[in-house]
Swiss-Prot record:
Coiled coil: none annotated. It is a peripheral membrane protein. It catalyses: a quinone + NADH + 5 H(+)(in) = a quinol + NAD(+) + 4 H(+)(out). It comes from Ralstonia pickettii (strain 12J). GO terms for molecular function: 4 iron, 4 sulfur cluster binding; iron ion binding; NADH dehydrogenase (ubiquinone) activity; NADH:ubiquinone reductase (non-electrogenic) activity; quinone binding. This is NADH-quinone oxidoreductase subunit B. Signal peptide: none annotated. The keyword 4Fe-4S applies.
Length: 160
């Protein structure tokens, strides 16, 4: 958190935007939407070697309790409405991480008739994590990029 000034009396001053965004970056609660082999790497990122808890990332079982969706794997046409329904059940503000080549653009199965060529056709994506499958380090880097994106957003509406 960038602090504009520290007074001698023990007060810290900052903008409300920076305070709210700082708290949001430290408490990301993703809902896993693991569809294929990328989900295994997502599980590795939550295990003890990488430990996403130190970033404030705690996996939640319900979309109503989460603010981040990690789409990991091949999205087929039959699963696309379910993805959209789960996304709509998430509370605002919400973010989406597209993990892996299949979620990003169809991947190896791009020309199949039953595969959606990127989950960004169904839900708005904030961060793309490349790879087939991407490593746990790549997912952690994607989460850090999402935290940087959240820090740059304006949360309080300004009068024009």
């Amino acid at each position: 958190m960038a602090i504009e000034g520290v007074l001698n009396e023990g007060f810290v001053t900052t903008t409300a935007d920076k305070l709210i965004n700082w708290t949001r970056t430290g408490s990301l609660w993703p809902m896993t939407f693991g569809l294929a082999c990328c989900a295994v790497e997502m599980m590795h990122a939550g295990a003890s070697r990488y430990d996403l808890d130190r970033f404030g990332v705690v996996f939640r079982p319900s979309p109503r309790q989460s603010d981040v969706m990690i789409v990991a794997g091949t999205l087929c046409n039959k699963m696309a409405p379910a993805l959209r329904k789960v996304y709509d059940q998430m509370a605002e503000p919400r973010w989406v991480i597209s993990m892996g080549s299949c979620a990003n653009g169809g991947g190896y199965y791009h020309y199949s008739y039953s595969v959606v060529r990127g989950c960004d056709r169904i839900v708005p994506v904030d961060v793309y994590v490349p790879g087939c499958p991407p490593t746990a380090e790549a997912l952690i880097y994607g989460i850090i990029q999402l935290q940087a994106k959240i820090r740059r957003t304006n949360t309080i509406a300004r009068k024009a």
